[in-house]
Structures are given as structure tokens and as C-alpha cells.
């Protein structure tokens, strides 16, 4: 037996009032970003492609999958940031049925690239761009008018899984992955400024029962991510060549997320229902070696969600999702050499810490309708959703999305 699948997507959107970031994929590349004090609204276009193939023979299964993302983020007014991203992930997996379990293993590889620049059309409005290095620090030698750079990176990962072959039993998952991203300054013959390293481990162990009209699952999870950053020591230039004479590991970041998660589902005449929830502990600690800077926060959180699905006819189905969550701060701390910091950097760091230690409440809702063309495997769908986030610092965030698509 064999099967193939694929998907294609396009997204366009807008982010309002973005400051202290002129690079795309902030969550991935932070703190090694390009930044300025002015910022503004940014527009984004994203193209996604995904496809795979799997074959099964007896107790053995083999599959391969490719995921590609191309993204363009830009601003139409000064400072005119632009980021162009290509991101390719390849996955290979195999599984074998042995005893009462299916044992699986997978390999993953990723290649990432981004070109990033900032331009000014009004000469009188030019402001400096900072090559940020973490917790309010900058690579001052290459900040100012050096506004064109690019990122190259990627990595690899391995995962192991065990799942019961029958409807009831224990299951487990483990994953290790490593990635690194190099920031290079295109203005100066692509000299590498910094390199960011990711090391991550994920472990999950649980029990489930999926038989009959009731489904129950409960698992415990631990996610650990260690990030570290090297700053290159760059010598004097010779014929536009900048030698690397050393490096220092200056930035360190440790993230922990551990939680218990549960699911309960059932079917009835009014449709299929599912409730899910989790409670957990989240911790984030950042450190810059010298001059010493620290920022940390820890939170306890809970989330409760629900889903309802029903077929309204042979060709129309409706799905409704809702969820609520709260993150409450339990500890926080900051150490900064404020006497030696620029006023604008002080304001940025204080603002960041203010929201790092804040408590957050979240609500989300989504409704989706699927329509299958009569006598065909082709379907159409429409989806409308939104997220509302409020925090204890009296600020809030809204996210709305609308999706239209074809399934086949």
C-alpha cells in the first residue's frame, strides 16, 4: 500500500507598530537581528508548499516529506526594511510493528537563508541601524550605516516514537535537534559577525484509550532549549578582506516548558465533541557575559480548549474550536549596567522586561466549513478565526485570519 499527499498555501498580512526589529523571523534569530528605534508597520507575504509519499509493506512503513516556505516581509515607508526568507525541511521516517507496539524513528534536515536590508528614501530621515547582540547590546563597530546582511543556517534532528497497536496503551516520544544560524554583513564582503546555536530536547510519555465512542489521553511533556551565541572578533581590513581573529561566547539562553496534557472526546447525535487542557511551568533565562546582564522570568499556566464537529449533510461539515489560557508570573529578575547604557536602549530593555514578567490571558476562536463537490474527491473550505491576548500591563493584542482553500 502507498499514499501521497500535498498542500500549497498563500498568506498575506500586516503587523502594526513593529520597533527594535528590522529582520524577519524574529523568534528564530533573536537576539542577532538588525534593529532601529523608529520601526513602523510591516507587510508580509508567505508561500508554503508541502508534499510527501509513504509506502507500507507488511509490518514495515517508510515515508518521506518535504516542506518549503518562502516569505517576503517589507515596509513601504522609511525605514524601509525588507526580509526575503527561504526555508526548506526534509523528513525521512520509518516504522515497524513489533509485539504490541509500533516503533518509529525519523530524521530531519533543514536549510535556511534570509537576505535582509534597510533603505531610506529621504536623506534627512536616515537613522542608525544597530547590529544587536543580546539584552540591549550591539556590535557598535558595524552598527550605523551597515544595513545589508544575510543569514545562512539550518540543522538536523532525530526523533523516536512508540505507539500501541491496539486502542489502549502507553505511548512515548523523544526528539533531539540542533540548529545554527550565521549572520553575515553583505556591505563588507560578507564578513560573519555572529553565530547562534540551538540545542533542544523533547520528551513525552502518556497513556491513551481510543476505542468505542469515548477517547481519553493523558501525557506528561518536557521541552528544553539551550541557545548560545558567538561574537566574532574581526581584525583590520586588508583589500576589503576582514580576518576573523577570534570569537567569544557572550549570549546564553535557557528555556524550559514542562506540562501535563489531557484529552477527552465523545460522539453523540449532535456531533463529535472534544475537550483538551493542560497545566504547566515555563521558564526563560537570558544572560550576557560581559558586562554582565541578566533577565529571567517563570510562569505557571493553564489552558482549556474544546472542539465540536458535525456533518450537516453529505457534502457539508462544520468545525468550531474555542480555547482560553492564562499565564501567571511566579518569579522574575533583571540585572543591567544602566549607568553605561544609552537612554533608548534602557527604554527598550525596561519595556521588554515589563512584558516578560507580566501575566497574560488569552482567548481564541475558530470556525471552519468544508464542502465536498458532489461525486468528487475535491473539496472547498472557508475558515475564520481570531486570538485575543491581554496582559497585566494594560496592553493587548488581536489577531484575525481568514482562509479559503481547496482540498483533494
Q: For each predicted feature, which ranges?
A:
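Short, flexible helix-coil linker/hinge segments at the edges of structured domains or between repeats
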Residues: 20-33, 106-152, 180-195, 234-241
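Membrane-embedded beta-strands of outer-membrane beta-barrel proteins
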Residues: 49-51, 90-92, 158-162, 203-205, ...
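Residue-level signature of outer-membrane beta-barrel architecture
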Residues: 55-57, 94-98, 162-166, 207-211, ...
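Transmembrane beta-strands of outer-membrane beta-barrel pores
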Residues: 10-14, 55-59, 68-72, 98, ...
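Outer-envelope beta-barrel architecture signal
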Residues: 2-6, 58-64, 99-105, 166-172, ...
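Outer-membrane beta-barrel "beta-signal"
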Residues: 396-408
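Long, internal scaffold/assembly segments composed of regular secondary structure
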Residues: 142-277
Amino acid at each position: 500500500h502507498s499514499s501521497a499527499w500535498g498542500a500549497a498555501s498563500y498568506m498575506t498580512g500586516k503587523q502594526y507598530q513593529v520597533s527594535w526589529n528590522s529582520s524577519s523571523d524574529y523568534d528564530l534569530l533573536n537576539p542577532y537581528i538588525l534593529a532601529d528605534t523608529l520601526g513602523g508597520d510591516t507587510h508580509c507575504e508567505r508561500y508554503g508548499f508541502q508534499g510527501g509519499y509513504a509506502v507500507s509493506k507488511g509490518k514495515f512503513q517508510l515515508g518521506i516529506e518535504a516542506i518549503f516556505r518562502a516569505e517576503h516581509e517589507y515596509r513601504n515607508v522609511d525605514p524601509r526594511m525588507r526580509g526575503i526568507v527561504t526555508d526548506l525541511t526534509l523528513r525521512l521516517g520509518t516504522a515497524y510493528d513489533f509485539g504490541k507496539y509500533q516503533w518509529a524513528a525519523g530524521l530531519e534536515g533543514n536549510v535556511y537563508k534570509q537576505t535582509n536590508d534597510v533603505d531610506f528614501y529621504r536623506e534627512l530621515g536616515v537613522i542608525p541601524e544597530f547590529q544587536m547582540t543580546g539584552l540591549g547590546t550591539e556590535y557598535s563597530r558595524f552598527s550605523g550605516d551597515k544595513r545589508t546582511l544575510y543569514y545562512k543556517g539550518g540543522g538536523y534532528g532525530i526523533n523516536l516514537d512508540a505507539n500501541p497497536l491496539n486502542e489502549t496503551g502507553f505511548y512515548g516520544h523523544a526528539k533531539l535537534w540542533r540548529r545554527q544560524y550565521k549572520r553575515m554583513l553583505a556591505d563588507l564582503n560578507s564578513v560573519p559577525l555572529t553565530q547562534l546555536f540551538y540545542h533542544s530536547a523533547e520528551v513525552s510519555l502518556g497513556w491513551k484509550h481510543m476505542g468505542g465512542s469515548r477517547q481519553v489521553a493523558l501525557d506528561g511533556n518536557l521541552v528544553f532549549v539551550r541557545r548560545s551565541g558567538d561574537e566574532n572578533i574581526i581584525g583590520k581590513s586588508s583589500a576589503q578582506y576582514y580576518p576573523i581573529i577570534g570569537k567569544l561566547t557572550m549570549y546564553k539562553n535557557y528555556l524550559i516548558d514542562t506540562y501535563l496534557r489531557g484529552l477527552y472526546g465523545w460522539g453523540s447525535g449532535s456531533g463529535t465533541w472534544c475537550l483538551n487542557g493542560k497545566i504547566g511551568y515555563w521558564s526563560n533565562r537570558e544572560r550576557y557575559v560581559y558586562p554582565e546582564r541578566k533577565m529571567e522570568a517563570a510562569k505557571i499556566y493553564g489552558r482549556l480548549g474544546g472542539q465540536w464537529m458535525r456533518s450537516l449533510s453529505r457534502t457539508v461539515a462544520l468545525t468550531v474550536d474555542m480555547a482560553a489560557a492564562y499565564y501567571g508570573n511566579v518569579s522574575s529578575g533583571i540585572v543591567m549596567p544602566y549607568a553605561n547604557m544609552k537612554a533608548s536602549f534602557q527604554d527598550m530593555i525596561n519595556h521588554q522586561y515589563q512584558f516578560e514578567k507580566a501575566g497574560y490571558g488569552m482567548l481564541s476562536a475558530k470556525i471552519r466549513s468544508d464542502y465536498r463537490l458532489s461525486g468528487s474527491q475535491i473539496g472547498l473550505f472557508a475558515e475564520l478565526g481570531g486570538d485575543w491576548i491581554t496582559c497585566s500591563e494594560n496592553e493587548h493584542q488581536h489577531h484575525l485570519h481568514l482562509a479559503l482553500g481547496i482540498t483533494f
